[in-house]
Amino acid sequence: MEFEHRPVLLAPTVDALLLADFAGKGAARSGRQDGAQADARAQRGVFVDGTFGRGGHSRELLRRLGPEARLVVFDKDPQAIAVANELAAGDARVTVVHGGFAAMREELAARGIESIDGVMLDLGVSSPQLDDAGRGFSFMREGPLDMRMDTTRGPTVADWLAQASVDEMREVIADYGEERFAFQVAKAIAARRATRPLRTTLELAECVASAVRTREKGQHPATRTFQALRIYINRELEELSRALASALELLAPGGRLAVISFHSLEDRMVKQCIAAAARPAVAHARLPLRESELPQPLYRSLGRVQADDEEIAGNARARSAVLRVAERTTEPLGADGAAAFVPAMRVPGEAAPARRGARRRPH
């Protein structure tokens, strides 16, 4: 069964990768690449779509790329990969990788690609995945409690809920769903599974609703819990962290990063990474150096874009979408590498990793 998918922020995302004078809200407006450089990238550049989905963004990008350009598309979803393979069969510029964008650096290296000219990520769950009850992402449709992006590997949400402790469930729901009734929800799940296992989405939604004491206007009481479980079972934030680090390492000078996020956890991570890489190192700030001798930022922020009223009217999912864009400068990475610019991740149940080489401003 085919499900309609409308790509969110389609034109702004592709513009962000290709237009020399692209600038979103809050963008730096000086020192960006010239039009000739941008045109050369469009004609012969290498681009990555880390979240192919049903290919809306990829098709628009291909329409605007030259015949010598190359596009590498990633997705964990077997259904998305089937669509991508059909596209690649008719367009020699397309290379398909069945896997997540977290492995971008390794997968590109295996194909002889050492640098790229642009990467776009459309985070979260897609409309076809939500609309397909059999995938288990929606609390509005009866389906198996799955939620895996890649249905060929890994435990389902039902598998994890059957064995997780109350503390583990509480921590995941609180951290990844920002649910203030996380403890009550975890206890309700534990009580329910003691009598019979949770097998379907509606069973879980009903269980969660019984534990959430107050209702947020316009939001189902299971929204935050479903988000948390999906993020956890697919390791979404951990994979985003790896992808942001890879982008910093792979992007050529003038190359662009364009990331669409749909909730505050993702957007905060992207925003913090761009902000950290857009600040010059300050270790030598008090030394008598000329400005040209000081380290420069790794990224130049090109701002953010949100959907306008017209797009939201035609696609309600666009309401919460935020596109953030950054441009790679000529400054080389330091000895600490890209990880120093990515926010430290704390996976529920594990200690927070130290952030190596984090640069601090002097007090």
From Swiss-Prot:
GO molecular function terms attached to this record: rRNA (cytosine-N4-)-methyltransferase activity
Task: Report the catalytic activity.
Answer: cytidine(1402) in 16S rRNA + S-adenosyl-L-methionine = N(4)-methylcytidine(1402) in 16S rRNA + S-adenosyl-L-homocysteine + H(+)
GO terms of biological process kind: rRNA base methylation
Q: Where in the cell is it found?
A: Cytoplasm
Entry binding sites for S-adenosyl-L-methionine: G55, G56, H57, D75, D122, Q129
Instruction: Enumerate the SUPFAM superfamilies for this protein.
Output: Putative methyltransferase TM0872, insert domain, S-adenosyl-L-methionine-dependent methyltransferases
Its chief place of residence is cytoplasm
Q: Which Gene3D superfamilies match?
A: Putative methyltransferase TM0872, insert domain, Vaccinia Virus protein VP39
In the record, the note on similarity to other proteins reads: Belongs to the methyltransferase superfamily. RsmH family.
Name of the molecule in the record: Ribosomal RNA small subunit methyltransferase H
Q: Which organism is it from?
A: Bordetella petrii (strain ATCC BAA-461 / DSM 12804 / CCUG 43448)
